[in-house]
UniProtKB/Swiss-Prot annotation:
Disulfide bonds: none annotated. Residues 31-50 bind DNA. This is HTH-type transcriptional regulator BetI 2. The lineage of its organism: Bacteria, Pseudomonadati, Pseudomonadota, Gammaproteobacteria, Oceanospirillales. Residues 8-68 form the HTH tetR-type domain. Pathway: Amine and polyamine biosynthesis; betaine biosynthesis via choline pathway [regulation]. GO terms for biological process: glycine betaine biosynthetic process from choline; negative regulation of DNA-templated transcription. The keyword Plastid does not apply. It comes from Chromohalobacter salexigens (strain ATCC BAA-138 / DSM 3043 / CIP 106854 / NCIMB 13768 / 1H11). Repressor involved in the biosynthesis of the osmoprotectant glycine betaine. It represses transcription of the choline transporter BetT and the genes of BetAB involved in the synthesis of glycine betaine. Keywords: DNA-binding, Repressor, Transcription, Transcription regulation.
């Protein structure tokens, strides 16, 4: 009989094992048996908790997305400056949080992006994540520029964040998070300057 309270622990253990297996051999070769070996459990446990490999991959991506949301929220909550530029900066920082850029997390993200083109459940997760990033950026940009400009700025910065992340994740040495953050912040400042609202966006009590 399983111990009371073991399920959350076991689920986290299997999610970490999934990321480790994908990091080691890629998604296609990350079999249920290999994941189970990484976790030190029987393969039947995966079916018991997740219904199989697809369910486990979905749970793994939900965990990474939760980590991303938490990283952004923590940075925004800690802000002493309520300016749009500060909030957008926190969003940038959260997207390059260590939970998103380690080898296992990065390779799991890449596997997720590829699989989402063919698996509706993963495609929905990807859509929700994309919309959340765009909506959060757009809301802050709209505080200092017209709606049409804010939408364009949000699309541009979201693409910049995704592009920096993707290029970094595909390099043999891995993603340089510090460089990616610097480039994204630089692009943000260029956007604000282009739309003529750098000063307003940097001030919490602008009119």
């Amino acid at each position: 009989m399983p111990k009371v309270g073991m399920e959350p622990i076991r689920r986290q253990q299997l999610i970490k094992a999934t990321m480790a297996a994908i990091d080691e051999v890629g998604l296609a070769e990350a079999t249920v048996m290999r994941i189970a070996r990484h976790a030190g459990v029987s393969a039947g446990i995966i079916s018991h908790y997740f219904g199989g490999k697809d369910g486990l991959l979905e749970a793994t991506m939900r965990q990474i997305l939760t980590d991303l949301s938490d990283a952004v929220a923590a940075r925004r909550h800690a802000l002493e400056d309520d300016s749009p530029r500060a909030h957008i900066g926190a969003i940038i920082e959260g997207n390059f949080d260590r939970t998103q850029v380690t080898g296992p997390a990065a390779k799991t993200w890449l596997a997720f992006w590829a699989s989402s083109m063919h698996k509706p459940v993963l495609q929905r997760l990807q859509y929700v994540n994309d919309r959340r990033l765009y909506a959060n950026l757009c809301h802050q940009f709209q505080r200092v520029m017209p709606k049409a400009d804010a939408r364009n700025a949000a699309r541009g910065l979201a693409a910049m964040i995704d592009g920096l992340w993707l290029r970094g994740a595909l390099t043999p040495e891995g993603l340089d998070a510090a460089e990616a953050r610097y480039l994204a912040h630089t692009y943000l400042d260029q956007l604000l300057t282009h739309y003529g609202c750098y000063q307003d966006a940097s001030t919490a009590d602008f009119k």
